[in-house]
């Protein structure tokens, strides 16, 4: 229950940020329009964001006929987790990665890149897909998709404020420097909110995935491999839609410094250490 309250507050913060930017562009009228737009975005995201994200990544749905081994693996893990069978997708990308999306367990989808299938053993791949199913089980998928959609909209609105300016309550033009500051700080604030939503949920999905697969060491090994391989392979679709990066099992974006500081994912080393502790002791560190 606490996680749901925290998530609601964080989503409210994203919506409030959206309204503030609307106010900078069009005063009180801009705030009202931004509020209506934010509510519309949340409604649209609830029903359609999974389809939108899968289309962004050109994900292709597979079946037991077209990808029998992979499909049956997901089917077996979903059964172990007590979940309905999700739709299964493959993305033709060299970078090893995977994500889950959908509004609830009854309307969920899991996707993996061809790159992850190429580098992981069957045991490691089971660990990764169990991690994604843990997101479904914990109902993280709606929150991550909603926050990704809203964060992307905030960035677009902030850029609009720079290029087209805005007006205050008296109709006077907003200082262009303020507009530039909004364009820089608003996406950063949205990223911080996404980070707060995502990091704790990744640890929980690691723990939950290890329980579903019964093999925390395999997931730890998979994370190590993905981390090493992903660092040297660009992911064009993720770079084009950076707000969706927090949905992935591993941050798909390249960059250092601030990019790492504000990463939506916990440090891979810490994730591995926690899983190895679980493998050795049977308990996941708090």
Swiss-Prot record:
It is a multi-pass membrane protein. The chain crosses the membrane at residues 7-27, 29-49, 146-166, 177-197. Zn(2+) binds at residues 131, 135, 202. Its EC number is 3.4.24.-. GO terms for molecular function: metalloendopeptidase activity; zinc ion binding. Its cofactor is Zn(2+). Binds 1 zinc ion per subunit. It is an enzyme of class 3 (hydrolase). The gene is htpX. It comes from Ralstonia nicotianae (strain ATCC BAA-1114 / GMI1000). Keywords: Cell inner membrane, Cell membrane, Hydrolase, Membrane, Metal-binding, Metalloprotease, Protease, Transmembrane, Transmembrane helix, Zinc. This is Protease HtpX homolog. It is found in: Cell inner membrane. The lineage of its organism: Bacteria, Pseudomonadati, Pseudomonadota, Betaproteobacteria, Burkholderiales.
């Amino acid at each position: 229950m606490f996680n749901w309250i925290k998530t609601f507050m964080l989503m409210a913060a994203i919506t409030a940020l959206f309204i503030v930017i609307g106010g900078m562009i069009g005063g009180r009228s801009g705030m009202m329009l931004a509020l209506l737009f934010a509510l519309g975005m949340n409604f649209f995201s609830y029903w359609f964001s999974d389809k939108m994200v899968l289309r962004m990544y050109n994900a292709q749905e597979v079946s037991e006929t077209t990808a029998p081994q992979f499909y049956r693996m997901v089917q077996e893990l979903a059964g172990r987790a007590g979940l309905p069978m999700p739709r299964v997708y493959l993305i033709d990308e060299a970078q090893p990665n995977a994500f889950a999306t959908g509004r609830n367990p009854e309307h969920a989808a899991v996707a993996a890149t061809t790159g992850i299938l190429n580098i992981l053993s069957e045991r490691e791949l089971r660990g990764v897909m169990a991690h994604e199913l843990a997101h479904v089980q914990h109902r993280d998928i709606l929150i991550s998709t909603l926050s990704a959609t809203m964060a992307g909209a905030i960035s677009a609105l902030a850029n609009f404020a720079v290029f087209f300016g805005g007006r205050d309550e008296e109709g006077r033009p907003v200082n262009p420097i303020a507009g530039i500051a909004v364009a820089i700080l608003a996406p950063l604030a949205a990223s911080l909110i996404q980070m707060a939503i995502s990091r704790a949920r990744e640890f929980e999905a690691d723990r939950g995935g290890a329980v579903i697969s019964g093999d925390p060491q395999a997931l730890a090994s998979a994370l190590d491999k993905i981390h090493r391989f992903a660092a040297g392979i660009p992911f064009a679709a993720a770079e084009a839609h950076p707000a969706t990066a927090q949905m992935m099992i591993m941050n798909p974006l390249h960059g250092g410094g601030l990019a790492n500081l504000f990463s939506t994912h916990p440090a891979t080393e810490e994730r591995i250490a926690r899983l190895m502790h679980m493998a050795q002791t049977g308990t996941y560190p708090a």
